[in-house]
Amino acid sequence: MALERSDVEKIAHLASLGLNDADLPHITSALNSILGLVDEMQAVNTDGIEPLAHPLEASQRLRADVVTESNNREAYQSIAPAVENGLYLVPKVID
């Protein structure tokens, strides 16, 4: 799947990105390269291959799951500008 300039402009608009007209050919080319790589990876036959979370069979040494900090929720909420029912109230930031 190859992207055209109009596709990149639409994606940029949906993502609220401001792109220069001079940058569009480079960005279109870069996105097409990425999509080409994805197409190559999807073309590989992976039937019978078990998915890996990590290429090496190693176990991680994890620390004990122990509480290390005290609950300061009440103290933090007492200095917050606005709290309701135990939740912090913040101004709307997305249109």
From Swiss-Prot:
Gene Ontology MF annotations: asparaginyl-tRNA synthase (glutamine-hydrolyzing) activity; ATP binding; glutaminyl-tRNA synthase (glutamine-hydrolyzing) activity
GO BP annotations listed: glutaminyl-tRNAGln biosynthesis via transamidation; regulation of translational fidelity; translation
Enzyme class at the top of the EC tree: ligase
Catalytic reaction equation(s): L-glutamyl-tRNA(Gln) + L-glutamine + ATP + H2O = L-glutaminyl-tRNA(Gln) + L-glutamate + ADP + phosphate + H(+); L-aspartyl-tRNA(Asn) + L-glutamine + ATP + H2O = L-asparaginyl-tRNA(Asn) + L-glutamate + ADP + phosphate + 2 H(+)
InterPro entries (alphabetical): Asp/Glu-ADT_sf_sub_c, GatC
Domain of life: Bacteria
Gene3D superfamilies in the cross-refs: Glu-tRNAGln amidotransferase C subunit, N-terminal domain (1.10.20.60)
EC number: 6.3.5.-
Assigned keywords, A-Z: ATP-binding, Ligase, Nucleotide-binding, Protein biosynthesis
HAMAP family xref list: GatC
Subunit description: Heterotrimer of A, B and C subunits.
NCBIfam families linked to this entry: gatC
Similarity annotation: Belongs to the GatC family.
UniProt function note: Allows the formation of correctly charged Asn-tRNA(Asn) or Gln-tRNA(Gln) through the transamidation of misacylated Asp-tRNA(Asn) or Glu-tRNA(Gln) in organisms which lack either or both of asparaginyl-tRNA or glutaminyl-tRNA synthetases. The reaction takes place in the presence of glutamine and ATP through an activated phospho-Asp-tRNA(Asn) or phospho-Glu-tRNA(Gln).
Protein name as annotated: Aspartyl/glutamyl-tRNA(Asn/Gln) amidotransferase subunit C
Protein's organism: Pseudomonas fluorescens (strain Pf0-1)
